[in-house]
Amino acid sequence: MTEQAITAAQMRAKDQFTINQIGIPSLVLMERASLAVRDAILTHYPAANKIVVVAGQGNNGGDGLAIARLLHVAGRGVAILTIGNSAHASSEHQTQAHICDYYQIPVASDPALLKDADLIIDAIFGIGIDRPVEGAYATVIKQVNAAHAPVVAVDVPSGINTDTGAVMGVAVKADLTVTFSYNKTGLVTDQGQAYAGRVIVADDMGTY
């Protein structure tokens, strides 16, 4: 397992090199990341069958949609709770949403969906957050934390600063975090560890 911890900027640079210089498409990296999260969920939460994926509109949310589809195909009960303005969705997110539509995976915008979940997947922000969480995002994060289900964070718990581990106003308190390619500097701080729970570094992502 890779021991090196890197910053958000370093991770973005590695992603961009892989996509632009090597030529591995972003959607391929997204699929590999999502497969790693799926595998972790099937290993650590094999009985989960009322899974709610909380997905933002960026590529972390796109990961979440791909994870929802992979869990659905694996026979798990899964629904998607969307947050944010879909008009601002990344192109990869839009592609994943189209695929989820094909599989008829339930999609909702009402956080009441969290009440009956037996597992929650946090795919709101990932490594990208650089300002305090506010508004509807803060509300949903608080509702995730108030739910009785365990939480798996995708890459970094939403609301945690990737570089420092600081809580950006409010943050998801995860039981398990699957982070991609390398650990992140914020996740090895005391506060980052407290919010990330157990950290799995999925280091076979094809990112160079």
From Swiss-Prot:
(6S)-NADPHX binds at N59, N60, G61, G62, D63, G126, I127, G128, I129, D130, R131, P132, Y137, D155. One of its GO terms (molecular function) is NAD(P)HX epimerase activity. Its cofactor is K(+). Belongs to the NnrE/AIBP family. Catalyzes the epimerization of the S- and R-forms of NAD(P)HX, a damaged form of NAD(P)H that is a result of enzymatic or heat-dependent hydration. This is a prerequisite for the S-specific NAD(P)H-hydrate dehydratase to allow the repair of both epimers of NAD(P)HX. This is NAD(P)H-hydrate epimerase. It is an enzyme of class 5 (isomerase). Its EC number is 5.1.99.6. It catalyses: (6R)-NADHX = (6S)-NADHX; (6R)-NADPHX = (6S)-NADPHX. It comes from the Bacteria. Pfam families: YjeF_N (PF03853).
